[in-house]
Amino acid sequence: MVDELLSAIGPDLVEFERRLEESVAADGPLADAMEHIVRAGGKRFRPALVLLAAALGTPDRDQAFNLAMGIEFIHTATLVHDDLIDHASTRRGITTIHETVGVNPAIIIGDYYFAKGANLMASIGEPSIDLAISNTVMTICLGELLQLTSRRDYDQSLEEYHNKIARKTAALVETCCYCGAVVANLDAPRTEALRQYGFLIGMAFQIADDVLDYTSTAAELGKPVGADLRQGTVTLPLMLALQEPSVAPALRALVAHEPMTDADHEEVVRLVCASSAIEHAEAQAHDFAVRARAQLAAFDDSPSRDTLERVCDYVVERRS
């Protein structure tokens, strides 16, 4: 589905992969640890958004690729550190870096790729891009702290949840689209439209991701179902289910167990899926996607705009 969706920039994505692998291979002792993560692929959602946004204007080709690689390295660095914090053993169906090389080397590898991503983006020579990515990394860190400090907080508000995912996920997606617009030399109104598109589609993406943690399968996700729940991360489906009288008492009793057993986790997933919480969470994701699509009215018809419109459907319909 992803290959078909991104066919408008298919050749660019092939070139992106070539440059990405070449860049990692040049990293000496860090290369072996990173290559298996890079070659595992993933959706390449963020660099694809960079290239799609850039294609709406007249970008310098090398700058667009450096921007896309910089974003992907920074995103990968956040995953390396997230997996450490969450004690995750797999990512995209393969062993995580800290399980492969150890905790201390994994911390250094994550730090290195934060710096490498920033270095690639600085090579573009555009101060607004440098400012955007530094602000974004700080925002992601704040989002991660919010997630850590709200673990097992089953009474957090919708506003608190939205603030958390805005920082942890939507901020980087917003930056992908904003920086893509900058290298595309778009005017201020269209740059702002793409920035708003990125934020809104990032919100939709994360809510859909939180739904998939309850409704997908381990094979589809590349990680165990209910992984967030097992780590104490309270997401929208559980928050909404806890407001339903038909399942709330049973859910409250289960999440009060310390520690929760595997059977407890499985029963929470079952109850959440049996409630209307999934439907309501999906409706929220859809609402953000609709608002994102509206931002594209600022652009004339083109293959890239058409793809960005279809991304709005993809983020809420995907299974992994």
Over which residues does each language-model region extend?
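Conserved N-terminal diphosphate/IPP-binding helix and adjacent helical/loop segment
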Residues: 1-76, 80, 84-99, 135, ...
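Hydrophobic faces of stable alpha-helices that mediate helix-helix packing
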Residues: 13, 17, 27, 74, ...
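Alpha-helix N-cap and coil->helix boundary residues
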Residues: 15, 29, 92, 108, ...
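All-alpha helical catalytic cores of prenyl diphosphate-utilizing isoprenoid enzymes
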Residues: 21-24, 40-43, 108, 122-218, ...
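Alpha-helical phosphate/pyrophosphate-handling elements in metalloenzyme active cores
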Residues: 31-70, 158-201, 237-242, 286-320
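Divalent-cation-assisted or electrostatically stabilized phosphate/pyrophosphate-binding catalytic cores
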Residues: 91-113, 155-169, 192-196, 218-243, ...
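Conserved ATP-binding module of the ATP-grasp superfamily
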Residues: 117
